[in-house]
Amino acid sequence: MTDQAEKKHSAFWGVMVIAGTVIGGGMFALPVDLAGAWFFWGAFILIIAWFSMLHSGLLLLEANLNYPVGSSFNTITKDLIGNTWNIISGITVAFVLYILTYAYISANGAIISETISMNLGYHANPRIVGICTAIFVASVLWLSSLAASRITSLFLGLKIISFVIVFGSFFFQVDYSILRDATSSTAGTSYFPYIFMALPVCLASFGFHGNIPSLIICYGKRKDKLIKSVVFGSLLALVIYLFWLYCTMGNIPRESFKAIISSGGNVDSLVKSFLGTKQHGIIEFCLLVFSNLAVASSFFGVTLGLFDYLADLFKIDNSHGGRFKTVLLTFLPPALLYLIFPNGFIYGIGGAGLCATIWAVIIPAVLAIKARKKFPNQMFTVWGGNLIPAIVILFGITVILCWFGNVFNVLPKFG
């Protein structure tokens, strides 16, 4: 079975799985959260986050390879660090998926209502639109997980085409005075203090760790293909993010982000700022298509993951009745939160970053340290000895401190 998987899938497939998982609607939060730090410091902290998340992923892979193919994250966590940490990990995974579902309901409501308003002249209520999109996605998941996967794949293909058209155009229109913030009233001020408030969102932008067990099922224990998938998949995401920052911060002045942030920082506000740069009709159309598809594909991906996680957690069967129960568990809590607090996209992504710090940063580092003691002759060990796990844990603690510093208004905020 493993040999057939190795022949069937090249490392390119794994690279696309990793990159496709992390690149989505969450990328709209990056320029908003990094507006204070602006391009050069923003790029710097994004690279730091990529380095740390790449190595936490490799540490998770290191621990995973000591167990039979198909072993779940729960199995490995329980065996190496005990049931208490396994429960903590399970709670954080569920919270991350729930908060991301809420964030994408919010983003869908905002961007689709804005698209309707711009093209049809009808001002749709974002809350109603958000709930309607949630009902649509819930209906698809109730019918079939395969249908949701196929729709996500279709959206991904269209998203790539529209991305190339739109940002190929914006790339050649970058104004270096805007990129350097030379014309701003705040030009010359320090950008460095603003990097800390963006750390949780930068971390959440590289959350591919849930795919590692799936990659091992696909490739078996061919560590060369697994390592290439993780390294080049996350590196591709980093390059696209840097390109995205270059295009956004080279076209939209830093001062304009204050209005975006004050309006809640949702996807529609950023898109309207892009449209204010006076683009041709085809570029405007492709920008709207890309924005809608980026959010929609992430929404399908996250809710599919949450649906499967809850079905496994509560041992709910795959009948229509069972799937209906799982759909209710998946969508009701975030939908109710959305009705109470509709403009929570940025806060949702940041909150996901906090919880992802535990299960995707700190726990993988601890698992690798424990695995090295339990399996001294393991087949793969991340370079750097115990220094790399220590750096990863330090990064995780820093992100947690920054998140709380942001919540309690200790850190400086832009806007």
Curated annotation (Swiss-Prot):
Functional description taken from the UniProt entry: Involved in tryptophan transport across the cytoplasmic membrane. Plays a role in transporting tryptophan which is to be used catabolically.
Membrane topology: Multi-pass membrane protein
Top-rank taxon, per record: Bacteria
Pfam families to which the protein is assigned, alphabetical: Trp_Tyr_perm
Ranges in the topological domain labelled Cytoplasmic: 1-11, 55-86, 149-153, 213-229, 308-326, 370-387
Localization, UniProt: Cell inner membrane
GO BP annotation list: amino acid transmembrane transport; L-tryptophan catabolic process
Organism: Escherichia coli (strain K12)
Annotated transmembrane regions: 12-32, 34-54, 87-107, 128-148, 154-174, 192-212, 230-250, 287-307, 327-347, 349-369, 388-408
Keyword flag Transferase: no
All ranges on the Periplasmic side of the membrane: 33, 108-127, 175-191, 251-286, 348, 409-415
GO terms for cellular component: plasma membrane
Descriptive protein name: Low affinity tryptophan permease
Induction (record text): By tryptophan. Is subject to catabolic repression.
Membership in a protein family: Belongs to the amino acid/polyamine transporter 2 family. Mtr/TnaB/TyrP permease subfamily.
GO molecular function, one term: transmembrane transporter activity
Lineage: Bacteria, Pseudomonadati, Pseudomonadota, Gammaproteobacteria, Enterobacterales
PROSITE patterns: AROMATIC_AA_PERMEASE_1
Keywords: Amino-acid transport, Cell inner membrane, Cell membrane, Membrane, Transmembrane, Transmembrane helix, Transport, Tryptophan catabolism
